[in-house]
Amino acid sequence: MGFAPVTPAAVETYDPDVDHDDESNGLDGFRVRSKRSGKFSGGYSDSPREVGDGYGVRSRARSNMKMYGGFKSEFDSDHDSGSGFGLKRKYNGNPKVSADFDADSDDEIVLVPKATRLRTHGKPSSGDFSHGSGGGFPLKSFGDRNFASHGFKPKNFSKPEPNFSQDLDYDDEFDDDRAEREGFNPRIQSSRSSSRVNGYSRKDGSYPRNTGASNGYGSSSRFKHEQMNAAAEVESDPIDEVVSSVKMLTEMFVRVENSKMEMMREMEKSRMEMELKHCQMMLESQQQIIGAFAEALSEKKSTNARRPVS
């Protein structure tokens, strides 16, 4: 399918008093629409930006221009059909107009294929273009690119706990938030109102689901609670506490005395050994003294016997 050539005579002359923002007047065989960025009109040549013969461009705030075209055998004012191509003007890759802009250069106009979002202007039709309600779509999407409906907020119904443990049984836990919503709000009255098991706490008054216990504690902490109760019952009698303390003191005293006696026994033994050694040394010295005197006397007697009598 080819497009018919557009001549200046076939294009309606531009009227500055008429609003061309929505769409141009019906043309037999060709239809031109402009959105926000610029206007196409025939015979308008006041602006220095010229495209073709007898075809002018009136630019607005943005530098993008779009063309919507299609062939129709008959004109319908209620519906339009737009398809084909998109024309996007770039100024050397910069969306802003520079001082050295050359409108006649081929590098300034770039054809950009668009296939982002369909925007129909009527009911889609599978027939030819002669139908007035043919489906058309712009080749550039406008507005928000988020295809979700406005006001839609996805709701997160579950939030994993950061301290989740696979070894912990969560079946016996009680949903406090649901209890508060249903009107049940247990209050904590004492320091033993909560039991901590592996870093997870349970409020007093919560009833385990899968167990028959009614003491307010889960199955994971029941054994510890029984031990605490047994210890509290044993320590409840003050006389027993006094007796146990006295017994402990006497045992400590006996141990201290035994250690003292052991120390004294060791010291006495060492002292007796030292005295025994001292006595032995004295006996040896006395024996040596007596031996010396005996030798001296014996020598004196022998000398007297050798002298002759005169």
Swiss-Prot record:
This protein's record includes keyword Secreted: no
A GO CC term assigned to this protein in UniProt: plant-type vacuole
Region (Disordered): 1-58, 115-135, 152-171, 177-221
Keyword Ion transport carried by entry: no
Protein name: Protein FIP2
Comp. bias intervals (Acidic residues): 14-25
UniProt keyword terms in alphabetical order: Phosphoprotein
Organism encoding this protein: Arabidopsis thaliana (Mouse-ear cress)
